[in-house]
């Protein structure tokens, strides 16, 4: 189960004044999924479904990382994005 701070940071991402880059969003996605679900056990999307494939890869890259560590990294990453895009 994720912490209240994690949930607050997940909401804060949507309130950034500037949309993060695609790479930043993929990093967030992977960390979010690893923190909330754990290791990726989904089938890799087909080659013609690039958006879902990139998201799958971002999550797959974190396989083996504990949900707690992923949550901590997600919170720190969001804090960095807030500092970057709110100044």
UniProtKB/Swiss-Prot annotation:
The keyword Transport applies. This is Acyl-CoA-binding protein 2. The lineage of its organism: Eukaryota, Fungi, Dikarya, Ascomycota, Saccharomycotina. Transmembrane segments: none annotated. It comes from the Eukaryota. GO terms for molecular function: fatty-acyl-CoA binding. InterPro entries: Acyl-CoA-binding_prot_CS (IPR022408), Acyl-CoA-binding_protein (IPR000582), Acyl-CoA-binding_sf (IPR035984), FERM/acyl-CoA-bd_prot_sf (IPR014352). Binds medium- and long-chain acyl-CoA esters with very high affinity and may function as an intracellular carrier of acyl-CoA esters. An acyl-CoA binds at residues 29-33, 51, 55, 74. Keywords: Lipid-binding, Transport. Pfam families: ACBP. One of its GO terms (biological process) is fatty acid metabolic process.
């Amino acid at each position: 189960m994720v912490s209240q701070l994690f949930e607050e940071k997940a909401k804060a991402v949507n309130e950034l004044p500037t949309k993060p880059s695609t790479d930043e969003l993929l990093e967030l996605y992977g960390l979010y999924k690893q923190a909330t679900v754990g290791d990726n056990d989904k089938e890799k999307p087909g080659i013609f479904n690039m958006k879902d494939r990139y998201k799958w890869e971002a999550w797959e890259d974190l396989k083996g990382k504990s949900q707690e560590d992923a949550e901590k990294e997600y919170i720190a990453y969001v804090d960095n994005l807030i500092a970057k895009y709110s100044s």
